[in-house]
Amino acid sequence: MLDREGFRPNVGIILLNARNEVFWGKRLREHSWQFPQGGIKYGETPMQAMYRELHEETGLHPEHVKIIGRTRDWLRYEVPDKFIKREVRGHYRGQKQIWFLLRMVGRDCDICLRATDHPEFDAWRWNEYWVPLDAVIEFKRDVYQLALTELSRFLRRPAQRAEKPRGPRLSRYPRVIGVQAQQTLTIVDTSVVCSEIEVEASTLDEMPPHVIVGK
């Protein structure tokens, strides 16, 4: 379903935790990261599409999140021809999106990347709200910046925690536990949660250092 200008109606989701960090998903078998997003089906409202895409891509249900805000109007990005199927070139130009800002009220363990038979992501992590967008595919970076900027007015200060005595500084570099070929690997990093995929030890060097694999 395209509009007259060749843009497909779509929703984008910025999911916050209590620390105002945002959910990033690593695209299946790729090295790029992105926010959940997806097309609006015929007869759906943007909100209905948002809840459907949220569940399909993260496994979360409406009771796991709270809507904080949304963009006032559509934000658009064009897709380069090399990423467009040949049969729709000349008609399809890109996506126009309504972006929703959600706060997660559930737990990290409620997130499931295999909620459907066709997962979009094979890993996920929490990132700072204003993290550089270098890991995002280039043609989406401008619309991400627009959405983050417009929705930043809804941010609140994270809850203050009682200061604890400082212990030894933990390394942010991952460590590997029980690495054996043909077995599930678990890479531990305090800023990342696990994906749900099995890999061989030989593929470890190809993975970005902040991904956890295994369950």
From Swiss-Prot:
It is an enzyme of class 3 (hydrolase). Belongs to the Nudix hydrolase family. RppH subfamily. Residues 6-149 form the Nudix hydrolase domain. This is RNA pyrophosphohydrolase. PROSITE patterns: NUDIX, NUDIX_BOX. A motif (Nudix box) lies at residues 38-59. It comes from Burkholderia lata (strain ATCC 17760 / DSM 23089 / LMG 22485 / NCIMB 9086 / R18194 / 383). Accelerates the degradation of transcripts by removing pyrophosphate from the 5'-end of triphosphorylated RNA, leading to a more labile monophosphorylated state that can stimulate subsequent ribonuclease cleavage. Its EC number is 3.6.1.-. HAMAP family: Nudix_RppH. Keywords: Hydrolase. The keyword Transferase does not apply. InterPro entries: Nudix_hydrolase (IPR020476), NUDIX_hydrolase-like_dom_sf (IPR015797), NUDIX_hydrolase_CS (IPR020084), NUDIX_hydrolase_dom (IPR000086), RppH (IPR022927). It comes from the Bacteria. Its cofactor is a divalent metal cation. GO terms for molecular function: pyrophosphatase activity. NCBIfam families: PRK00714.1-2, PRK00714.1-4, PRK00714.1-5.
